Amino acid sequence: MAKEKFNRTKPHVNIGTIGHVDHGKTTLSAAISAVLSLKGLAEMKDYDNIDNAPEEKERGITIATSHIEYETENRHYAHVDCPGHADYVKNMITGAAQMDGAILVVSAADGPMPQTREHILLSRQVGVPHIVVFLNKQDMVDDQELLELVEMEVRELLSAYEFPGDDTPIIAGSALRALEEAKAGNVGEWGEKVLKLMAEVDAYIPTPERDTEKTFLMPVEDVFSIAGRGTVVTGRIERGVVKVGDEVEIVGIRATQKTTVTGVEMFRKELEKGEAGDNVGVLLRGTKKEEVERGMVLCKPGSITPHKKFEGEIYVLSKEEGGRHTPFFTNYRPQFYVRTTDVTGSITLPEGVEMVMPGDNVKITVELISPVALELGTKFAIREGGRTVGAGVVSNIIE
């Protein structure tokens, strides 16, 4: 299939494979691309191609990730696969690869394992909204009862982490067999199971709202005063659309203020509207330059509120990644870099956790010295003297 054009006519969805090491995530990724390539919907990627994941940097953290793309009859998918468990943890916490849904791969021969549980928990914490399950290595299980037992265990595990375990689609098959069939040039009985899995992914994982359809939010990067025109705030619109005449709120650091947009410009040109992804200057009516600062956000009124205290799931960089060389304890006070600014905060570790070592991932409670616009899923970096020592995501807002 030629690579030249990106088909924009089909809705786009981001997914990824998750699950325990050696349960077949990468083999399944290869099998999906191989089976769909026979239908002219993907380029075949073999296992080694995917397993040799290039390293990427996201928020100062090196993560090995493979990206493959393919289509079904209904959608265009970007699919991410990570070689190592630590890469998954980092990927999910930094949001390097935002997932609209995930395919949880569980070996039917082994059942759920520690990382199966950990990936489900992480999915819950970082807000992966939907999971579809592939029970792999079905060809190695002769006993139908054993297969049913594993399925039941997986459903219970999903329910334990507040996913709808009873309603989750679970497809059994063999990624390796499907891949072998596809390499021989046909979609056989195992390939059909992969197609069935993709049909479930199509049906069960909803098409995400596009960024432009969400409520308006723009982190403030800079503030200028233009003689005779008023105050301009600049930044990159994170989501939604802003138009002249819109009422907006300025949230974070200080008390929330309301104002009206009197102009939107990009590269010195006036625009009717700015939308997600645009770098714009927004002119605000009656707002003084000293009332706005970097680290605040402009948003649709009532859509996001300032908070000081929250719980977060964090990954702490190892020494090799340029992180700390020593553990930290409760009352550690680093800076939390949220969107465009650093705010000092103090960390409380969960009960029973004495200290956190470089390379760990853990749930923490944070209390910031000044309030910042936060919501579930807001990403942050943890910094010490300007260098990144960790990354996290807000999993619960306390006050």
Curated annotation (Swiss-Prot):
Residues 81-84 are annotated as: G3. One of its GO terms (cellular component) is cytosol. Its main location: cytoplasm. Pfam families: GTP_EFTU (PF00009), GTP_EFTU_D2 (PF03144), GTP_EFTU_D3 (PF03143). Keywords: Cytoplasm, Elongation factor, GTP-binding, Hydrolase, Magnesium, Metal-binding, Nucleotide-binding, Protein biosynthesis. InterPro entries: EF-Tu_GTP-bd, EF-Tu_GTPase, EFTu-like_2, EFTU_2, G_TR_CS, P-loop_NTPase, Small_GTP-bd, T_Tr_GTP-bd_dom. Residues 174-176 are annotated as: G5. Residues 136-139 are annotated as: G4. Mg(2+) binds at T26. It is an enzyme of class 3 (hydrolase). Residues 10-209 form the tr-type G domain. It is found in: Cytoplasm. It catalyses: GTP + H2O = GDP + phosphate + H(+). Residues 60-64 are annotated as: G2. Its EC number is 3.6.5.3. One of its GO terms (molecular function) is GTPase activity. PROSITE patterns: G_TR_1, G_TR_2. NCBIfam families: EF-Tu, PRK00049.1, PRK12735.1, PRK12736.1, small_GTP. Monomer. PANTHER family: ELONGATION FACTOR TU, MITOCHONDRIAL, ELONGATION FACTOR TU-RELATED. Belongs to the TRAFAC class translation factor GTPase superfamily. Classic translation factor GTPase family. EF-Tu/EF-1A subfamily. This is Elongation factor Tu.
